[in-house]
């Protein structure tokens, strides 16, 4: 309770097994944007935040500008989502996809001293 009041705990959640709820297809997607123009980047971020299939999203360094963790019912659903991404965000230059073969560790636990 004290950690919640201090703002250390953002929210309480349940970690759901994606396979158990029919979302067993999981993907790690790297997105590269054309330009770091503020309004275009914010449009992409709004789209990412509004899409329920995107579980996590990170602005990163390296070859990609963003890395997304995505769940889907199958490859076809993922393909539709990526088509929507490209249509809604012309500033996206390209994306790369890693298909998750199996989950080694899943959670949002942060060690606290």
Which stretches of residues belong to each language-model region?
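A compositional/biophysical signature of low hydrophobicity enriched in polar/charged and small residues
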Residues: 1-113
């Amino acid at each position: 309770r004290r950690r919640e009041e201090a703002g250390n705990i953002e929210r309480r959640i349940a970690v759901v097994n994606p396979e158990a709820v029919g979302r067993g297809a999981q993907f790690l997607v790297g997105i590269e944007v054309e330009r770091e123009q503020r309004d275009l980047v914010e449009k992409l971020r709004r789209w990412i935040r509004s899409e329920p299939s995107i579980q996590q999203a990170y602005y990163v360094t390296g070859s990609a500008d963003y890395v997304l963790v995505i769940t889907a019912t199958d490859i076809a659903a993922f393909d539709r989502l990526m088509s929507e991404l490209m249509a809604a965000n012309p500033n996206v230059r390209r994306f790369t996809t890693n298909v998750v073969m199996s989950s080694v560790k899943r959670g949002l636990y942060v060690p606290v001293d």
